[in-house]
Amino acid sequence: MQNPQNLIWIDLEMTGLDPDSDVIIEMATIVTDSELNTLAEGPVIAIHHSDEVLARMDEWNTRTHGASGLTQRVRESKVSMAEAEAQTIAFLEQWVPKGKSPICGNSICQDRRFLYRHMRNLENYFHYRNLDVSTLKELAARWAPDVRDSFKKGNTHLALDDIRESIAELRHYREHFIKL
């Protein structure tokens, strides 16, 4: 059910960090209410790219995405970047009106840069504001390092896992740092 207070969480896995030369290889979304309760999980999409594109990944991405099985899923996928964008927007339209939710996640500006370059319609679906959990992590590192250090992430570098961790991390900071 559409609600303008719902929050859209997104995570992308990419072949690297430069949106001009790297591409999105996996994406996932979760919609929560304003209290961070999960309402729905969107499609988890491995986006097809050629072996030539995948061969340009650096050592870290090659190792990480190979070990997680993502590289193989990308090779086997039949979903294009445009199809992934359309599927994701169709899911989001059920839960949040266009332009209402900030883009939510960890280091979300990086994801937004890739969306702006490769999936402009999806990037435009979000409000211009960002809800970046990394901001609280950086503040906690300076003002309450024990709070930051008490949250442990799994670091699977799979999009859906990363979103779930981002939501859990924000809950952690809400309880132990902001203390609401």
From Swiss-Prot:
Keyword Transport: no
SUPFAM superfamilies: Ribonuclease H-like
Exonuclease domain residues: 7-170
Compartmental location: Cytoplasm
EC number(s) recorded for this UniProt protein: 3.1.15.-
Organism whose genome encodes this protein: Pseudomonas putida (strain ATCC 47054 / DSM 6125 / CFBP 8728 / NCIMB 11950 / KT2440)
PANTHER family the record matches: OLIGORIBONUCLEASE, MITOCHONDRIAL
Record-linked SMART domains: EXOIII
Keywords for this protein: Cytoplasm, Exonuclease, Hydrolase, Nuclease
List of catalytic residues: Y128
The protein's name in its UniProt record: Oligoribonuclease
Record-stated family: Belongs to the oligoribonuclease family.
